């Protein structure tokens, strides 16, 4: 169930995109989806690490060691939402644009997979560092609110609400 408070935070996030110049509702939902995926990758990796530690099993993080993007390398931990969300706006933006987004586009490495075909055309469209900083902060607040609700279907409800905004945006121009 999407509460009034959660709807308000989602509306604020939507407004950040619109006032920042990203006015196509499909682009807004697409960018939100990419950013949610990036955050979820970090969260899922952290859960797997904790579970492995509890069971005394090894865990190889997808963010472990150096990650190569093109002909450059970066410490994989820099690509984690939980790391870069604390960066100053300019550094967060360059990290997202130059490292995180290319990383998720090539996550599976198999150029023929359905994932690679879908992500092959993905473009990071957030236009400014300050806008990204505000979006990341707002998304952190949304995730915090979603954790408090503790419903198994909250994510689906949030996405349904986003899609309803898409329908409304189409009607309102």
Predicted regions and their residues:
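Non-catalytic, mostly N-terminal accessory regions of nucleic-acid modification and defense proteins
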Residues: 1-173
């Amino acid at each position: 169930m999407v509460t009034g408070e959660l709807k308000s935070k989602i509306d604020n996030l939507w407004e950040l995109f619109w006032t920042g110049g990203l006015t196509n509702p499909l682009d807004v939902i697409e960018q939100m989806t990419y950013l949610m995926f990036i955050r979820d990758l970090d969260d899922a990796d952290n859960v797997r690490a904790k579970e492995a530690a509890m069971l005394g099993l090894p865990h190889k993080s997808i963010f472990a060691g150096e990650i190569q993007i093109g002909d450059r390398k970066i410490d994989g931990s820099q690509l984690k939402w939980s790391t870069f969300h604390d960066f100053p706006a300019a550094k967060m933006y360059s990290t997202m644009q130059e490292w995180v987004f290319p990383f998720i586009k090539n996550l599976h490495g198999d150029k023929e997979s359905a994932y690679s075909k879908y992500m092959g055309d993905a473009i990071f469209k957030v236009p400014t560092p300050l806008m990204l900083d505000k979006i990341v902060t707002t998304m952190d607040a949304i995730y915090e609110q979603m954790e408090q609700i503790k419903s198994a279907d909250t994510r689906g409800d949030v996405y349904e609400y986003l899609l309803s905004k898409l329908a409304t945006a189409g009607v309102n121009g």
